[in-house]
Amino acid sequence: MAEHSPATEIRSNAERQVLFLQGPLSPLYKLTGDRLEALGFGVHRINFCAGDWLHWHGKGCVSFKRRPTEWPAFIEDYLRTHGITDLVLHGDQRLYHRVAIEKAIQQDVYVAVTELGALRPGWMTLERNGLSTLSHFPSDPVSIMRIAEAAGQVDLTPKYPSSFWLQTAPDVVYNLTNVFLKPLFPAYQRHTIYPPIQEYLRGAVRLLKEKRRNQAAEHLLASLREKAVRYYVLPLQLEGDFQLRRHSPFDSFEQVLEIVFQSLAEEAPEDVHIVLKSHPLDVGFEDWPGVSKRLADRFGVGDRVHFLDGGGLAKPFEEALGVVTLNSTAGLEALQAGLPVKTLVPAHYDIADLTHQGDLATFWHDPVYPDTDLLSAYIQALAASTQVRGSIHNAEGVVVAADNIARKVAIRDLNSFGSYVDPPPRLARARALGVPL
């Protein structure tokens, strides 16, 4: 077969028009767009707020300043009139992104969705059409084993450690820009739920108390160990997390606590306890220690519920009997630590022989441990098909991520090795549980 000349490749690429919507708070999308443009692709960007504009403006960029109700007609027309062939966006559940994906699929546009990596640190997620419950990655063990075998060994060596400043500074700059320049984009509907300035003030106070919180967490774990307490871990999730708001039937994590505490009271052995682990990015709007104490007392398990507000997950996992989670990526960490995991709604890793498929009542008494061969295959298959190397929280990592995303989009190699299953294999089960998708 004759090789394609560079000129032929450029002409072929020039027929493709790539539209970028909101990206993560980093230079990632601008860098990715630059790489695609260098390959001859037409590159477009729609900005929705001043923070978006700050990250990327100039050639190929337009601003959407109309009301959100006008977005469906706008994006439908934009896709058609500009001949868009590929759509790239970060997260699939933001209002503007949900609509754009729907309109893009209707026009046979290739949709690439990015998110922070499932195998953090040092990875980014890149999937076709949807994430989490809407992921097209298979959920049956046979297919996963087949993908892992086809992909071969993937280098999982940790790379690109996160920088505190690259996590925090871009977030602060982006959101404060939106606050002070809101008159330029008065109709913009943000996807976060907390006022940014209040969130940063609370976060600063929490950071000042971090050493004290970590010490308290160590003392609590030492006390539980000394008393030989048998406990499960329940990692809390953020109220603003789309995993809760869109990929579960719940409006608040308080409802999750009610379900778990009631089951603990009525169905678990009397010597089983729960350790709640706060989310590392929670700044305290909800007062989860107070909420959990009130609920635990209501269900009569106040002496069996403990709140851990510091440290990571590795230490509490060491002595845990297992992990109960809504659908957090912490569940995958628990599986990698060899712990049984029960998800309350379908998570990406909620797969037969990996997670406990029975109800909470059976989980308390006889939790199913993950099959180590399947877990290894799942991680290899995931890394090879829906993850790319790189990180937005590392200066070198963001460049690597841009290179890898641009390469994958250019050759349309998302969900590779046969890892695209339609319809999304987790969706029917999620809808049966009341997930609003």
State what each model feature region is.
Residues 1-49:
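N-terminal subdomain of nucleotide-sugar transferases
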Residues 66-80, 280, 285-330, 336:
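Donor nucleotide-activated moiety binding/catalytic core segment of transferases
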Residues 137-182, 354-437:
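Leloir-type glycosyltransferase catalytic cores
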Residues 17, 85-86, 231, 273, ...:
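Structural motif
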Residues 86-92, 96, 309-355:
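A donor-sugar binding/catalytic signature common to diverse glycosyltransferases
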Residues 39, 185-291:
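Conserved catalytic-core segment of nucleotide-activated headgroup transferases in glycan assembly
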Residues 112-211:
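Catalytic core of nucleotide-activated saccharide and alditol-phosphate transferases
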Residues 25-31, 48-144:
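Active-site and donor-binding regions of nucleotide-sugar-utilizing enzymes
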